[in-house]
Amino acid sequence: MVDNKDFNEELKENIQEELDNETKAENPNIDEEVEEVSEDIKADEKVIDFEELQALKEENTMFKSKTKKLENELEALKDRLLRISAEYENYRKRTDKEKERIYTDACEDVLIKMLPVLDNLERALAVDGTVEDLKKGVEMTVRQFEDALEKLQVEEISTENGFDPELHQAMMVVEQEGAEPNQVAQVFQKGYKRGDKVIRHSMVTVTK
C-alpha cells in the first residue's frame, strides 16, 4: 500500500521539475539572467557599503576637527585663567604694600604732630617753678595739642544742638529746672570726630 504522504511529496517534486523545464524552455538564458541579477544586487550592496563608509569617515573627520577646536579653546581658557590669576596675585601684593605704606605714612604724620606736645610736657616737668608756672606750661601744651588735632582735621563734637545718639553716649538722665528735654546737661568726656567718622563719642548727661 502506497503512503499518501510520500505520494504527495513525489507529486510536488514532479510538478516543480516540469515547471522548471517549461521556464527554461521558454527562457533558455534564465540561469544567466538570475546570475546577472544576483551580481547587480551584490554590486549595489557594495556601493551602499562604500557610501556608508565614506559618510562615516567624513563624520569622524568632522568630529575630530571639532574635538581639536574645543581642545584648543580649552587650552586658551586655561592660559587666560593662569594669566588672570597671576595678575590678581600681583595686584593683591601691590595693594597690600600700598596699604602698608599709607598706614606707615599716616602714623608718621600723626607722630610728627604729636611729638612737640610731648616735648613741651617734658620741658614743663623739668622746670623748677610755681604751680602757676606749671599751669601755664600745661595750658600751652593743651593749645599745641589742639593745633595738632586741627591739622589732622580732628574736631571736638559739639553738644549745643542737644543730645544725638550718633554723636553722644548718655551716661544718665537728669532733671534740670528750666531746661528743655533731651538736652546735654553736662559733658563727662569730650568726643571727637574726623569728617563724618566719630573717633570717640562724647560721654554726657541728658535732661528729661
From Swiss-Prot:
Pfam annotation, one family: GrpE
UniProt organism field: Clostridium perfringens (strain 13 / Type A)
Name by which UniProt lists this protein: Protein GrpE
Subunit structure: Homodimer.
Gene Ontology MF, one: protein-folding chaperone binding
Localisation per UniProt entry: Cytoplasm
Gene Ontology annotations of biological process type: protein folding
Record keywords, A-Z: Chaperone, Cytoplasm, Stress response
